[in-house]
Amino acid sequence: MKFQLLTLVSIATTTLAINLEQVRLINDDELMVQDAQFDYPAIVNLKDQDAEIAKKTITSSSSTTTTTTAKKDKKTTSTTSASSTTTTSTKSNSTSPSSSSSKKHKSETASITKTGGADSVAAAAAVGGPILAALALLL
């Protein structure tokens, strides 16, 4: 009986955590069908949007050196850390190949929509967690 109740509560919590209101279909042409409730267009062509987005280059480098020397009673530790971050954002409307500042790269986007999945999981955990703990204490 306890296992059945735990299974039922687990399924109910999972159902609450999954956002069933938005249906996404991604096919070979990168077309995405979205729900109008989220104020997105019904069909979005990701390839066209990628062409319109400004190119962004983010370069980050970090180096850390740690040296530890231990003798009988003496221990010496030195730590050196250096970090630099360079962010460059360029927006280009021309597609001429003679431009020397343009870089050709293909970017891949997993999802461009804000589905609120993390918020729904956090809300379900905030509500379902204490309920599950209370049920566990009662059983």
From Swiss-Prot:
Leader sequence residues: 1-17
GO cellular component terms given for this protein: plasma membrane; side of membrane
Endoplasmic reticulum recorded as keyword: no
Prosegment location in residue numbers: 117-139
Region (Disordered): 57-115
UniProt-annotated glycosylation sites, renumbered to this chain: 93
Highest taxon above the source species: Eukaryota
Compositional bias ranges of the Low complexity kind: 57-69, 77-101
Residues passing through the membrane, by range: none
Topology relative to the membrane: Lipid-anchor; GPI-anchor
Subcellular location field: Cell membrane
Keyword annotations: Cell membrane, Glycoprotein, GPI-anchor, Lipoprotein, Membrane, Signal
Lipid attachment locations (GPI-anchor amidated glycine): 116
Name this protein carries in UniProt: GPI-anchored protein 53
